[in-house]
């Protein structure tokens, strides 16, 4: 199930509740990269809607959870959603609610709050195209028992990954990658989160390009 987020939030009527939100609404922060560069917290989904309009989202898992209370058994839906612009930004979230639609809406909001930048590149020695179609180097992520390793692949390889990981990679803008997995990958959330954390680790290393960009800002 894939849809495009459009027109859900009235940004003109948005009244920011945080300092970062006010800076965005006033035009003092003009890009989401500036937020990540300054390590500022994203606590309002409208910040993401304002700076990254037109995000896609895809529901990767919906399950029913039950809880026993004094009033009896309460049944709720749990949804796991991935959001991304297919161009270097991706987020993962989950939400619970008594109604299916509200669970998805809550998961989308949480995914937007968890949005991260993804460094892309052409890291395979078999490919010298220089385009941002894969990961620039090998990265790994772990969630629960699931570990995911992403390795650069030459252009045209495609996404050699499980269905859940493919969704995360595609919405992040990765089109070619080798993946290696360990653990219980049937657990959709842990599989998706391990992939998400591996992509987050693409910015854990400082590259020569980062130093060059830092010098230009000085």
Curated annotation (Swiss-Prot):
Recorded GO terms, molecular function?
Answer: rRNA binding; structural constituent of ribosome
Q: Which InterPro entries match?
A: Ribosomal_Su5_D2-typ_SF (IPR020568), Ribosomal_uS5 (IPR000851), Ribosomal_uS5_arc (IPR047866), Ribosomal_uS5_C (IPR005324), Ribosomal_uS5_euk/arc (IPR005711), Ribosomal_uS5_N (IPR013810), Ribosomal_uS5_N_CS (IPR018192), Ribsml_uS5_D2-typ_fold_subgr (IPR014721)
Which keywords belong to this entry? Ribonucleoprotein, Ribosomal protein, RNA-binding, rRNA-binding
Q: Which Pfam families match?
A: Ribosomal_S5, Ribosomal_S5_C
Q: Can you give the residue ranges of the S5 DRBM domain?
A: 55-118
Which GO terms of type biological process are on file? Answer: translation
- The lineage's top-level taxon is Archaea
Q: Name one GO cellular component term.
A: cytosolic small ribosomal subunit
Cysteines paired by S-S bonds: none
Notes on the domains: The N-terminal domain interacts with the head of the 30S subunit; the C-terminal domain interacts with the body and contacts protein S4. The interaction surface between S4 and S5 is involved in control of translational fidelity.
Which PANTHER family does the UniProt record give?
40S RIBOSOMAL PROTEIN S2, RIBOSOMAL S SUBUNIT
Q: Tell me the subunit arrangement.
A: Part of the 30S ribosomal subunit. Contacts protein S4.
- Name the family: Belongs to the universal ribosomal protein uS5 family.
Q: What does this protein do?
A: With S4 and S12 plays an important role in translational accuracy.
Q: What is this protein called?
A: Small ribosomal subunit protein uS5
The species this protein was found in = Aeropyrum pernix (strain ATCC 700893 / DSM 11879 / JCM 9820 / NBRC 100138 / K1)
Gene that codes for this? Answer: rps5
